[in-house]
Each structure stands twice: as structure tokens, then as C-alpha cells.
Design a protein with these regions (language model features):
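Short beta-strand/loop motif that positions the catalytic acidic residue
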Residues: 284, 291-293
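Conserved alpha/beta-hydrolase
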Residues: 99-119
């Protein structure tokens, strides 16, 4: 009996060893990242910056920018930053990350799966599940940095990634505080339209069209893509003009961004149509949420209804005279002092 037990234990140890080797292999990134500073904002002299790579639990390699306060000592609080939806880390999320690093936090801005410099095929597809996982994978990475306190990690989600950050925080109890800035709930807007205006008949028709597109994609062996984003043709709503003025001008244009004249796959909405991401927002409590939104933003109702659905502690901070896109890059309007106070108080 003892001999058999020893053999069993030996086999178990060998299996664990093989599993560990597989895990090490799994964790090896293989992306080629640009070395040049190609952000839409000026590089700070107060912060050290480097490109990094890590994998999410689906095996997709993510590209990110790590920002560390210069001359930092000891274990520091950390913040992972994602968004806006269809943007890259060289845009708004990088600006937020660098600015918060100037204020004493180790920060990480990342490209979501299938976009920017991150891996994943086909290109330019989004998923409420995988993109929520991207946030938690960023927590994995930043929490393993030698200068980061694993018990003091927060999140910032911008635009459509505000909803993703809330979803990730609900499920990932390692996150101690979360900010949703100028947020969208992408599952709500894709399934119900702006201001919940889509009728059941319209929803059914959309799903039928998406099903038909799947037949075409399967037949062709490659996904079809939507029309280029943020190209104005005339007669657009003001918020669409605002998007153009950020993504398609020197203010915020970046060639790798979906929103800068590229496009999502036609079938990207499918999983968003049937997977509401804020179902468990109450489970973020007792960890705090800060919602930040512009007074004049077309999207303000997303933060207001999410705020009502969330449990305490929570706060909704309205930025006077700001529209949706202003909170992407207008450093005179983004309430960085408010964000700093929030994370300083709650990541301690």
C-alpha cells in the first residue's frame, strides 16, 4: 500500500511539474511593440514609462504601457485603466494613466484583446466577457510588480470601458475601488439603442440580420467589417461630430484605433445583445464606486441609472459644461484632483 501511495504521489508531482512548465510557456508573450512614443499626449518627465506584455486567461497576449512615478519607494497603490470603447492605450486611457502616475500611483493602460497592439484574431472584435477578463488580466500583471501593493489596486474605465470596469470589479474582489468616467453600458446601447429606443421587433430584426451575416462570414472564411467609424457625411448628431473631432483630428487620432477611421466586425454586437454586464453591480459594495460624467453628455443617463442600481458607497460627480468626449482628454475638465482624492482614500 505504501509503495503504491508513493508511486501515486510521484506521478502527481510529475503532473504538477508538467503543468507548471505548460503555464510558464503559456505566459511567454510574443508581440512586437513599437519603441517610439506615439501617444496623443505629451510624455511626462515625472514618470518612468515602459511597454509591457501579458496574457489573459484565454491566452491572448495584451500590450500595455506601465507608468511608474519617478523616484518611487516602497510598495505603491496601483490603478489599471481601460477605454474608451474603440480606442487604444495611446489615447485617453494613457493620458489618465500617466496623470495618475504623476500623482503617486503605479498605473497600467492596456489595449483590449483583438485591438491596438494586443493579440487576438480576427482583428477589431469586442466581447463583454473577454474584455471584462482583460481588466482582470491587467490586475494580475500589475499586482505582480515588485513596487505594487496587491491589496491596493483600483480601476478606471472610460466610456464603454466604464461598464466593463464595473463588471470586472463586481467579479474581481481584488479590486478595492473603481471609477467609471463618461461611461457607456455597451450591452445596453447595443441591445436597446440610445435611450432604450429599440422595440422588440427591431431587436428581432437586428438579430436575424446578424445571423444572416454569420452565414456569409462562415462561407467566406473571414469576417465582414462595418463602415469606417467617425467619418462624417453630413447631418450627424452633435455627439457624433464630437467623436469625429476627437478621433479623426490631430487632437486624438491614432492609426491603430478602431474609432479613428477603422471599424468593428459586423457581428461584434452579437454577444453584447444578450449579456447585460451590470447585472451584478450591487456586488461591488462595500467597495466604493465613483461615477464621473459631463453635464452636457448625451451618455449621462448611463451613469445616472448605474448609480441608482449600485449599492453604497457610491458617488455621482457631474462635471459642469462638459460633454461626453471632453472627459477623454480635456485636462482642464477631467477632475483629476477628485480621482486622486478618491483613490488615496480608498487604496490605503
Amino acid at each position: 500500500m505504501q509503495t503504491r501511495l508513493k508511486k501515486t504521489l510521484s506521478m502527481l508531482v510529475l503532473s504538477i511539474g508538467a503543468f507548471s512548465m505548460n503555464q510558464n510557456t503559456f505566459a511567454t508573450p510574443e508581440l512586437k511593440l513599437t519603441d517610439k512614443w506615439d501617444k496623443t499626449f505629451v510624455q511626462s518627465k515625472k514618470v518612468d514609462h515602459k511597454k509591457v506584455m501579458f496574457k489573459n486567461r484565454y491566452g491572448i497576449t495584451l500590450a500595455a504601457d506601465l507608468y511608474i512615478p519617478k523616484n518611487a519607494k516602497g510598495k505603491l497603490p496601483a490603478i489599471v485603466v481601460g477605454g474608451p470603447f474603440g480606442a487604444v492605450k495611446e489615447q485617453s486611457s494613457g493620458l489618465y494613466a500617466q496623470t495618475m502616475a504623476e500623482r503617486g500611483f503605479v498605473t497600467l493602460a492596456f489595449d483590449p484583446s483583438y485591438t491596438g497592439e494586443s493579440g487576438g484574431e480576427p482583428r477589431n472584435v469586442a466581447s463583454p466577457d473577454i474584455n471584462t477578463e482583460d481588466f482582470s488580466a491587467a490586475v494580475d500583471f500589475i499586482g505582480l510588480q515588485p513596487n505594487v501593493d496587491q491589496n491596493r489596486i483600483g480601476m478606471i474605465g472610460i466610456c464603454g470601458w466604464g461598464g466593463m470596469a464595473l463588471n470586472a470589479t463586481a467579479i474581481d474582489k481584488r479590486v478595492k475601488a473603481v471609477v467609471a468616467s463618461t461611461m457607456y453600458d455597451m450591452t445596453r446601447v447595443m441591445s436597446k439603442g440610445y435611450n432604450d429606443s429599440v422595440t422588440p421587433e427591431q431587436r428581432t430584426k437586428t438579430l436575424e440580420q446578424l445571423g444572416a451575416q454569420r452565414w456569409l462570414d462562415a462561407k467566406n472564411g473571414t469576417p465582414a467589417y462595418q463602415s469606417p467609424y467617425n467619418v462624417l457625411k453630413g447631418g450627424e448628431a452633435q455627439f457624433q461630430v464630437d467623436y469625429h473631432d476627437y478621433y479623426m483630428t490631430p487632437r486624438g487620432y491614432h492609426p491603430r484605433a478602431v474609432n479613428s477611421g477603422n471599424a468593428w466586425t459586423v457581428t461584434t454586437p452579437i454577444s453584447f445583445m444578450n449579456m447585460p454586464i451590470l447585472s451584478y453591480i450591487k456586488e461591488i459594495s462595500p467597495r466604493p464606486i465613483l461615477f464621473v460624467h459631463g453635464e452636457k453628455a448625451h451618455s449621462r443617463y448611463f451613469s445616472e441609472t448605474a448609480y441608482e442600481a449600485a449599492s453604497q458607497p457610491k458617488e455621482l460627480y457631474i462635471v459642469p459644461n462638459a460633454n461626453h468626449v471632453d472627459l477623454y482628454d480635456r485636462v482642464d475638465l477631467i477632475p483629476f484632483d477628485k480621482l486622486t482624492d478618491f483613490f488615496t482614500k480608498n487604496l490605503k
